[in-house]
Design a protein with these regions (language model features):
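Structural signature of the Rossmann-like NAD(P)-dependent dehydrogenase/reductase core
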Residues: 11-12, 89-90, 137-144, 183-188
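Conserved glycine-rich cofactor-binding loop
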Residues: 15-17
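The beta1-alpha1 cofactor-binding region of Rossmann-like NAD(H)/NADP(H)-dependent oxidoreductases
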Residues: 61-73
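Catalytic loop of short-chain dehydrogenase/reductase
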Residues: 93, 100-112, 132-179
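C-terminal helical subdomain
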Residues: 179-180, 186-192, 198-248
Length: 248
């Protein structure tokens, strides 16, 4: 917390899953949290609970694939007053239908790239003035181990490609934004039991939340351009394919 009040963080895709849990954890750590979600009404109960215990939280409508929505979100966050000390690019999509390459639909391919790669890039660009104003900030991109070449198995090509692009963005922006004291890192949360990951996911949601929150708190430091991984439970089997094999 600073003399002017708590540091502010925006979390995209914060209406459920990892984004919501990370937002709640950051509020508990003393951050002023802005939940970015496509429908603000979805987080009404969350806002009420957080405010009931004195946490400084708010929400803005934000669709990371819509430039108009992004611009409106920037204006809404600016109206809250003060700079933005951290941005968590968590919003993402996964399409089970594209498991086999021949089943990939053009619309899904575009959606994967727009949401998982272009969205974080354009959101970061739009919020750059507010991040610069903090005098030391953090951008955290939620990625996936599916982008690692040693996991390639011929499945989910569009998703892997989009997350690999996100990793390239992370490394390049870490260099570009270093003069502004903005660290840019990626976090691999593992395969976690959320709406996206499914109930059979073997990795720890709590560990993923801790990894994201820890990356946010690197704001103003010098640890940048890194791929940070959540701690995995011993013997975690990785993601199970339809044929019974596993992948991580």
């Amino acid at each position: 917390m600073t003399a002017a009040g708590p540091r502010r963080v925006l979390v995209t895709g914060a209406s459920r899953g990892l984004g919501l849990r990370a937002a709640e954890a950051l509020a508990d750590r003393g951050w002023s949290v802005v939940l970015g979600c496509r429908r603000v009404g979805d987080v009404g109960p969350v806002l009420a609970r957080a405010r009931g215990r004195g946490a400084p939280v708010s929400a803005v409508a934000l669709d990371v694939t819509d430039p108009g929505s992004v611009a409106a979100a920037v204006a809404a966050v600016a109206e809250l007053g003060g700079p933005l000390h951290a941005l968590v690019n968590n919003a993402g999509v996964f399409r089970h239908e594209e498991e086999e390459f021949q089943d990939l639909r053009p619309g899904d391919a575009l959606d994967l790239l727009l949401t998982n790669a272009c969205g974080p890039l354009l959101v970061t660009r739009a919020f750059l003035p507010l991040l610069r104003a903090a005098g030391g900030a953090a951008v955290v991109n939620v990625t996936s181990r599916d982008a690692d070449e040693d996991t390639f198995d011929g499945l989910f090509t569009g998703y892997r490609m989009a997350k690999a692009a996100l990793n390239a963005m992370t490394r390049n922006l870490a260099i570009a934004l270093r003069p502004d004291r903005i660290v840019v890192n990626a976090v691999d949360p593992g395969w976690i039991p959320t709406d996206m990951g499914g109930p059979e996911a073997p990795d720890s949601l709590d560990a993923a939340v801790a990894a994201v929150a820890g990356a946010v708190e690197l704001a103003g430091g010098d640890r940048t351009g890194r791929l940070l991984r959540a701690q995995r439970p011993p013997g975690s089997p990785g993601r199970r394919r339809a044929d019974g094999a596993t992948r991580r």
